[in-house]
Amino acid sequence: MTRMVMLQGTGSDVGKTVLVAGLCRLARLHGRVVRPFKPQNMSNNAAVADDGGEIGRAQWLQALACGVPSSVHMNPVLLKPQSETGSQIIVQGRVFGQAKGRDYQRLKPQLLGAVLDSFEELKAGADLVIVEGAGSPAEINLRAGDIANMGFATRANVPVVLVGDIDRGGVIASLVGTHAILPEEDRRMISGYIINKFRGDQSLFADGIGAITQYTGWPSFGIVPWLKAAGRLPPEDSVALERLSRSSTGALKIAVPVLSRIANFDDFDPLASEPSVDLVYVRPGEPLPADAALVILPGSKATIGDLADLRAQGWDKDLTLHRRRGGRIIGICGGYQMLGNSVADPLGLEGAPCRVEGLGLLEIDTEMAPEKTVRNSAAHSLEYDMALSGYEIHLGQTDGPDCQRPALTIRGRADGAISADGKVMGTYLHGLFGNDEYRAALLQSFGISNGTVNYRQSVEQALDDLARELESVLDKAWLDQLIG
């Protein structure tokens, strides 16, 4: 019989994703066939699963931790925010439609069937399935029709472990308050709790553990400190991105403006792992640093809206000055589209039908089209003459004079563009910098020739270290019962 557990949180960003990844790797190290599952995720950081279709990149990472191919069934409902109130809905890897918050609440009961079907698909042949909730089950205003937390757990009969984040303060109130506010049907699904992100002497919190157990009746399954290995894994979403800071003496400064609907920003994690690179995320209200040698425009879930926001920040002027100073610019996917002369959306796929002026840094034009390209891709760098791997997730077609100088070929067709002076380049290929050989060639073009890290190997090692850290601090009896 397949074992199951679901990690839910007292709030968002309490560390569920990392804990699930670590437990998945730990089970794998113990020889178990384990798979991750997240019924509903909200993120513009998407991956192309090995069986085709989009899932959250967190679930892609968790599949890597399990040592199994990623599948659309690992994240059957993915919400990709396009505005403050609306999202694109991906169901089992495919576009289902778009909806604003209130409309989506009405849609959720229709999606439960797909969620349960995907869960059954994953359970087949697995020793263990580790499920990750979303947000908090204490958001009882969202309980009706819920598919992300207790609504799923009660229907699928999956025991729940509640995760509380002590670093943000108030963890006792968060756990006890969750117990108090949940209906009895949901409370009885919870088998225990984990305190996450602890700093300092754990013995000082012994009375806190006693108080939580006294008020809730739940046992503690362990106190998890700040995990060193977690810092070597890609952050899941822009909430984590806002807190990222990097103090580096790297010789090469690379700037990435944080767009409102930034997507797939884990494209840049391989660059951040390089000792010779000082990767700077530029927040709204900050200028692009004048001493950056390279500026990379990231992907976006709303190219036209983010282009307007970019101008509102004055980053368009910063980019023009950067190029005049001899700096280089790379655009990835939506960032590539912004670099051109125009972006047209005649069907209103991102909002009202319109055509807007681009940054004019590449002689190209883009028109949005309803057919979405979603695929893993083998590619070839024309600039450095080397094989690449990556993935595509985009709407629209791009053409123009600079496309006659393509950056890559993808599946044998030309992709991207390079300016006449060679200073500006764009491509639709995500995952470009994850290719170690390409990253080394790029750094060498800036005079950095001291080698690069093996990025995939570094992530695998971080997952191993994470698993061992968790094994040393979590309750042994609980782990034995879970993993066997």
UniProtKB/Swiss-Prot annotation:
PROSITE patterns found in the cross-reference section: GATASE_COBBQ (PS51274)
Residue ranges the record marks as coiled coil: none
GO BP: cobalamin biosynthetic process
Alphabetized UniProt keyword annotations: Cobalamin biosynthesis, Glutamine amidotransferase
Active site feature: C333 (nucleophile), H430
Pfam families linked: CbiA, GATase_3
A Gene Ontology molecular function term of the record: ABC-type vitamin B12 transporter activity
Domain of life (superkingdom): Bacteria
Pathway assignment: Cofactor biosynthesis; adenosylcobalamin biosynthesis
Positions of the GATase cobBQ-type domain: 251-438
Entry's family note: Belongs to the CobB/CobQ family. CobQ subfamily.
Function: Catalyzes amidations at positions B, D, E, and G on adenosylcobyrinic A,C-diamide. NH(2) groups are provided by glutamine, and one molecule of ATP is hydrogenolyzed for each amidation.
Protein name according to UniProt: Cobyric acid synthase
